[in-house]
C-alpha cells in the first residue's frame, strides 16, 4: 500500500511538472539578459512613436520657418548697421513688441535694446510716433507702461508715444495695430531672430511693415541660441494664427497713434 501511494505521489508530481511545462508559464522572475531584452521589447514601440512625432514636428517647424523667411524677405534690416534691404525704410510709426520686465519697473536688457532702437528711429526722423505693445494681464505686471516710461527717460516726447495694453503676443499686436489703431504702414522693432516671424505675421494680416531688428542679443550666446530655436516652434503657431484668422482682444477704436503722428509733424516744422 505504501509503495502504491509512493508511485501515485510521484506520478502527480510528474504530471504537475508536465502541466507547468505545457502551459508555458513560469513563476520565476525574469533576470539578467532576459530582463533587459524584455524591457527593450516594451520600450521599442514607445521610442518609435516618439521619433515619429518629433519628425512630424520638425517638418512642420521647417515648413513654417520657410514661410516666415519667404514672406519677410526684403523687409528686414539690422538696427545700427545701415545695411539690409530695408535700410532706407521710413514709416509714420514704429511698433515695439513687448518682452519681459522686472519687478523694479525696469525693462529686461533685450526689451531695452528694442526701445533704444525705436528711440533712434524717432530721433533720426525715420518715424513720427512709437507704439509700444505688450502684456498687462497680471496684477503688478505691465509691459506697456514700463516701455513708455523707458522711452520718456530717453527723451522721447510723451505726445509721440501711443500704448497698446493688449499686445499679448505678436499676432495680437499686428492685428490690433491694423484694426484698432488704424495703422497701415509701420517699422516693426524686435530682436533680429524674431523679425522673420513677426514681419511675416504682420504682412499676412494686411499691415505693411519693414522690420528693424536689434542684434545685440547675439552677445548672449546661450540665450540667443535658445530663443532662435524657440522661434522654429513658434513659427508653427504663427501659421495657425494666420490661417485661422483668430480674433484677438479688440475693444474700441484708438486714435492715439494718429494723434501722435500729427503732433510730431506739427512740432518738426
Annotate the PLM regions.
Residues 225-247:
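A transmembrane-helix-recognition feature enriched in membrane-embedded lipid enzymes
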Residues 31-84:
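N-terminal type II signal-anchor transmembrane helix
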Residues 10-12:
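Low-complexity, intrinsically disordered Ser/Thr/Pro- and acidic-rich segments
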Residues 245-269:
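Short linear elements at protein peripheries
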Residues 24-25, 36, 233:
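Intrinsic disorder/low-complexity detector
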Residues 2-7, 19-20, 24-30, 67-229:
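A structural signal for short, hydrophobic/glycine-enriched beta-strand patches
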